[in-house]
């Protein structure tokens, strides 16, 4: 049994299980079907652009399925050069990179300050040991 035959069989089995074949409704898979007697259902394990049409005279528009499954995420992020947002979905917009920069600068400052304090403490400990010895 070939891959296409397995996908078609899986689609028919899925349609029978959901009752879409009996009621004439279209499953919510992103595939637009012309209203009529036949039903179009995509296989659960198959890609969105593969559909099994049941009945005669069914016109299936696969463009909606392709757009839903294969579309690249288009967003304005720093990395794509299409905007100033970080693209994290936090709603920060152009403030996101500014906040990230301030937090990063604060972290670097705190790290450098702690290194200076540690080196000053170790110098004092060395001087104290020399004075006590």
Swiss-Prot record:
Record region (MIC, self-assembles, binds magnetite, Fe(2+) and Fe(3+)): 112-133
Molecular function terms, GO-annotated: metal ion binding
Applied relevance: Transfection of a codon optimized gene into human adipose-derived stem cells yields cells with magnetic crystals; the crystals do not have a noticeable effect on cell proliferation, migration or differentiation. A fusion of MIC to barstar (an RNase inhibitor from B.amyloliquefaciens) binds and stabilizes coprecipitated magnetite nanoparticles for at least 2 months. Cells transfected with barnase (the ribonuclease target of barstar) can be specifically targeted by magnetite-bound barstar which could be used in cell-specific cancer treatment.
Location relative to the cell: Magnetosome membrane
Main subcellular location of this protein, as a coarse class: membrane
Cytoplasmic topological domain residue ranges: 1-82
InterPro entries per UniProt: Magnetite_Biomin-Domain
Positions of region (GL repeat): 83-92
Transmembrane segments: 83-103
Topology within the bilayer: Single-pass membrane protein
Effect noted on mutating residue 122 to A: Makes wild-type crystals; protein is in magnetosome membrane
Family from the record: Belongs to the magnetosome Mms6 family.
Subunit structure: Full length protein oligomerizes. Full-length protein interacts with MamA.
Free-text function comment from the UniProt entry: Promotes the formation of magnetite in Fe(2+)-rich conditions, when magnetite is not readily formed. Binds Fe(3+) and Fe(2+). May play a role in nucleation of magnetite crystal formation. May help control production of crystals with a specific morphology. Greatly improves the formation of magnetosome-like magnetite crystals in vitro. Isolated short protein, probably residues 75-133, binds up to 18 Fe(3+) per monomer and self-assembles into micelles about 21-26 nm in diameter; the C-terminal 21 residues also self-assemble.
Domain description: Fe(3+) binding by the shorter form (residues 75-133) is inhibited by Ca(2+) and Mg(2+). The C-terminal 21 residues (magnetite-interacting component, MIC, residues 112-133) self assemble into multimers up to octamers; this fragment binds Fe(3+) which alters its structure. Another paper showed binding of MIC to Fe(2+) via Asp-123, Glu-124, Glu-125, and Glu-127 with a minor contribution from Glu-118. The isolated lumenal MIC binds Fe(2+) and Ni(2+), Ni(2+)-binding may not be physiological; in this paper binding to Fe(3+) was poor.
Protein name from the UniProt record: Magnetite biomineralization protein Mms6
Organism whose genome encodes this protein: Paramagnetospirillum magneticum (strain ATCC 700264 / AMB-1)
Record lineage: Bacteria, Pseudomonadati, Pseudomonadota, Alphaproteobacteria, Rhodospirillales
Designated gene of the protein: mms6
């Amino acid at each position: 049994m070939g891959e296409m035959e397995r996908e078609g069989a899986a689609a028919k089995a899925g349609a029978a299980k959901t009752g879409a074949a009996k009621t004439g409704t279209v499953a919510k898979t992103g595939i637009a079907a012309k209203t009529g007697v036949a039903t179009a259902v995509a296989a659960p394990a198959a890609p969105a652009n593969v559909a099994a049409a049941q009945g005669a005279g069914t016109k299936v528009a696969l463009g909606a399925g392709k757009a839903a499954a294969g579309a690249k995420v288009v967003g304005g992020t720093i990395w794509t050069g299409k905007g100033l947002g970080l693209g994290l979905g936090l709603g920060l917009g152009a403030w996101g990179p500014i906040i990230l920069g301030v937090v990063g600068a604060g972290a670097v400052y705190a790290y450098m300050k702690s290194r200076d304090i540690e080196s000053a403490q170790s110098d004092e400990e060395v001087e104290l040991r020399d004075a006590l010895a």
